[in-house]
Curated annotation (Swiss-Prot):
GO terms for cellular component: host cell plasma membrane; membrane. GO terms for molecular function: GTP binding. It comes from the Viruses. It holds the Pfam family F-protein. Residues 48-65 have a biased composition (Polar residues). Homodimer. Interacts with host CD247/TCRZ; this interaction induces down-regulation of cell surface TCR/CD3 complexes. The keyword Coiled coil does not apply. It is found in: Host cell membrane. Residues 1-103 are annotated as: Disordered. InterPro entries: HIV-1_Nef_core_sf, HIV_Nef. Residues 88-96 are annotated as: Acidic. This is Protein Nef.
């Protein structure tokens, strides 16, 4: 417990800290105090010394950020090319393409008659579907989602159920689920 200044420091760490502060002073534009070995940053007119390795007020120099080449490109054209290569989820040419998540984020409840009635009453209560902004893109997304959601077979049907093909196809037909 106690403040950080009350703890004893080992000799090797003190030497390391001084070397780091000296190196930091060279890169940040500060200067090392010759007598105490502490770090100083020049403030005009204040005459105060700071012991923190702060680089506030320093200007950005080219090459400071090594792992972010878009910050220091050789040319504006390179910057744009690099950004375009690394934009995984944003493409300007993909406005006409439509997609949706493969798996839902929350488990879907199976649609029952009661849920359908509740949903229709909820929509009517909120004013119906009139006045909603129509978007061709949203319409395609909903069509794809409904197609995907309602063409998936329940687990008890299909070729993985262990039932003979005639039987599981008859069950799908009875439920009104298309099969291919």
């Amino acid at each position: 417990m106690g403040a950080s200044g009350s703890k004893k420091r080992s000799k090797p760490l003190q030497g390391l800290q001084e070397r780091l502060l000296q190196a930091r002073g060279e890169t940040c534009g500060g200067r090392c105090n010759e007598s105490g070995g502490g770090y100083l940053q020049s403030h005009e007119g204040s005459g105060r010394e700071q012991n923190s390795p702060s680089c506030e007020g320093q200007r950005y120099q080219q090459g400071d950020f090594v792992n972010t080449p878009w910050r220091t490109p050789a040319a504006e054209r390179e910057k744009e090319l690099y950004k375009q290569q690394n934009m995984d989820d944003v493409d300007l040419d993909d406005d006409d393409q439509v997609g949706f998540p493969v798996t839902p984020r929350v488990p879907l409840r199976p649609m029952t008659f009661k849920l359908a009635v509740d949903m229709s009453h909820f929509i009517k209560e909120k004013g119906g579907l009139e006045g909603l902004f129509y978007s061709q893109r949203r319409h395609r997304i909903l069509d794809l989602y409904l197609d995907k959601a309602f063409t998936l077979y329940p687990e008890e049907f299909g070729h993985n159920s262990g039932l003979p093909e005639k039987e599981w196809k008859a069950r799908l037909k009875a439920r009104g689920i298309p099969f291919s």
